[in-house]
Amino acid sequence: ASSDVLVIGNDIKGMKYRFARCCNPIYGDEVFGFISSEGVIKIHRTDCPNARNIRERYPYRMIATRWSGKIGDQFAATLRIVGRDDIGIVTNITSIINKEKNATLRNISIDSHDGIFQGHLTVGVSDTRTLRELIKKISTAKGVKDVQRAL
């Protein structure tokens, strides 16, 4: 990861960081850094399921972190999607994603029971605005009942 996408502390240079797998932050999310025992800064979303535990138990290992003005690579975001199991629903959803120039479908898994499908889509997006637009478009697809960013 290149350090020009994030500003850590008072713009500390050369810090190694990784995006936490528990919450998969993307450009535009509110984030904080957690200095791991290996000395690597793990970047978490402020609404991460682990954030409260970190704040309570390790406040001294937290470091202020914010995004710089530069949008970098694509970030993986997982969406949970529920809807009516119709023929062509997956094709409709994937074509919506394929039409977005700033989004890439990375993974899809869908299960169907009793006429209802549930699935997870992993998409590559450059920022939260792109993700919100994509969620809005997918939610308007015929048969889709709910689309949310998964944690």
Predicted regions and their residues:
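N-terminal non-catalytic structural scaffold regions of very large proteins
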Residues: 1-80, 85-90, 99, 106, ...
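Short, well-structured beta-strand/strand-turn elements
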Residues: 103-106, 144-147
